[in-house]
Amino acid sequence: MPTNADLTMKIDLAVVMTGTYITTFSGGVPTSASISLIMAPYQIQLDFSGSGVNYASTLSMKLNSQEIMGYTMAMKYASDMKSVEQISGSVRMPPIRFDGWVNAQAMIVAMSDSTKRLDVAYLNSQMGVVVVQTSDDAQLGTLAFKLYTDPETGIKSPQVAVVYSDGSWEWLADILSGSGTKSSFTRWSQPR
């Protein structure tokens, strides 16, 4: 297995991308990896390390020197290494950041069980994630499951919402897709 590589991409003799890849293995299992790509004005850095059932990963994507997306996560796998039991850390999408933990395997099992998948109280007990406005490091609210009813079919399903500190809430998917209300974008970019 290759443990390192350097990459240079040229177009008409001009360097347009460079990259590096470095990894270590123990008994054929990767214990660390670092990947770096630069394609001006973008830079991407991805790192991964761990052993046993505990692993960590970081990602930073930058435009010039400004981070446009990133994460720092710790993952605990089940002893058989077939599933992730818990994820903790942060996901950064300036001007917001999500900090907290999720019991991933418990949520996957619950969502697969027709009797538990609509139990939003149980699903919410399996995560603790706060939403932070990054420039002031101010907590805006928390992530929580709410029941969504499809207007065409009437079928209910749990969906993630941002519950603001004043008790109001919006669907996370609407906010991230840009179809949330104007107030949601004001909340993300303005200090409260």
Please describe what each predicted stretch is:
Residues 1, 152-192:
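Acidic/polar, low-complexity intrinsically disordered N-terminal segments immediately downstream
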Residues 33-41, 62-64, 87, 159, ...:
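Short, surface-exposed secondary-structure junctions/capping segments
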Residues 23, 74, 93, 171, ...:
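Intrinsically disordered, low-complexity, compositionally biased regions/tails
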Residues 19, 71, 143, 173-175:
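Short hydrophobic alpha-helix segments
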